[in-house]
A protein has these predicted regions:
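Acyl-donor-binding surface of acyltransferase catalytic domains
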Residues: 3-11, 16, 21-31, 37-107, ...
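Glycine-rich loops and low-complexity Gly/Arg-rich segments
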Residues: 108, 132-135, 193-196, 203-206, ...
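A conserved beta-strand-loop-helix scaffold within acyl/acetyltransferase catalytic domains
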Residues: 6, 64-72, 88-190
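Active-site/acyl-donor-binding loops of N-acyltransferases
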Residues: 67-68, 80-88, 212-259
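Short, low-complexity, polar/charged sequence segments that are solvent-exposed and flexible
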Residues: 102-104, 127-130, 187-189, 197-200, ...
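Short, Lys/Arg-enriched, disordered terminal segments
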Residues: 1-4, 259
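Acyl-donor binding region in acyl/amide transferases
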Residues: 5, 14, 24-55, 140-143, ...
């Protein structure tokens, strides 16, 4: 590998996710835990603090860290489920090994995050595929100082020849890695760039000795985020207890509730 429309009232709108008011929650959605909706400003932090936030169900979104157990999907309220991969339990599925072999002709460069014109142009192509709640810019997802906030930031740029076709961004703690965001040119979907860059990030995380890789939230209903469950070693957090427990890999096309 070469390393060169929310129908319910909402009180916060965060980058395409609507956070529901408590009154709406109690009348329209029954969940077996206390309603959580927390936001805090981001700043450069020690790796141990970044680890702790991720372990407690926080995720990083632009200039803020957010933590919420309810969102909406297709105008319906649902629960959120923080997920992570315990890297000591991770193994490549046969389809993932096949993808890595298929993409050996791509060139990968990794280094500190730098947002330039090339990545901004790629983001414009990427957001064209988003049909609802289209984000304004990359900084809807990344801090204005993404190379150092909330921690050391690294990017994985994927090229076909000289063309940038995908780029993903991670932030490093002492033991944990946050998969913060990924952009790609939808014209090159045949390379499965979203899954491919996740695999690059996971392999890098293992190489650096990380313990956990955090891809963010999935929903309690089937959604576009279910690809995050397509990995061995996955765990999910219980909002009520804060305890992480293993869950089975959910291959593409399988209902996520079967995992």
């Amino acid at each position: 590998m070469n390393w060169k429309n929310c129908s319910a009232p909402c009180n916060v709108r965060l980058c395409g996710i609507h956070i529901i008011t408590k009154s709406t929650l109690t009348t329209q959605l029954a969940i077996p835990y206390e309603f959580i909706n927390e936001i805090r400003s981001l700043h450069p932090m020690p790796g141990s603090e970044l680890d702790r936030l991720l372990e407690n169900g926080w995720r990083f979104l632009g200039n803020e860290a957010v933590r919420h157990n309810v969102a909406t999907w297709n105008s319906e309220m649902c629960g959120t489920v923080p997920v992570r991969i315990r890297l000591s339990d991770f193994t490549l599925a046969s389809s993932q090994m096949k993808l890595l072999r298929k993409n050996t002709g791509l060139r990968v460069q990794t280094g500190p995050i730098v947002i330039d014109r090339e990545k901004t142009a790629l983001f414009e192509k990427h957001k064209a595929r988003i049909r609802e709640r289209t984000p304004d810019s990359l900084f809807s997802f990344l801090n204005v100082y993404p190379e150092v906030v909330p921690g050391e930031g690294r990017e994985f740029s994927v090229f076909l020849g000289d063309e940038l076709i995908a780029c993903s961004f991670i932030h490093l703690g002492d033991k944990a890695v946050s998969a913060t965001y990924c952009i790609f040119n939808p014209d090159y979907g045949r390379f499965s760039p979203g899954i491919y860059t996740m695999l690059l990030e996971i392999l890098y995380s293992i190489e650096r000795g990380s313990v956990f890789y955090y891809p963010g939230y999935v929903y309690s209903v089937p959604s576009q985020f279910d690809y995050k469950l397509n990995f061995h070693g996955s765990e999910q957090m219980n909002w009520n207890t804060g305890v992480w427990t293993p869950r089975k890999r959910v291959p593409p096309g399988m209902n996520h509730t079967q995992g």
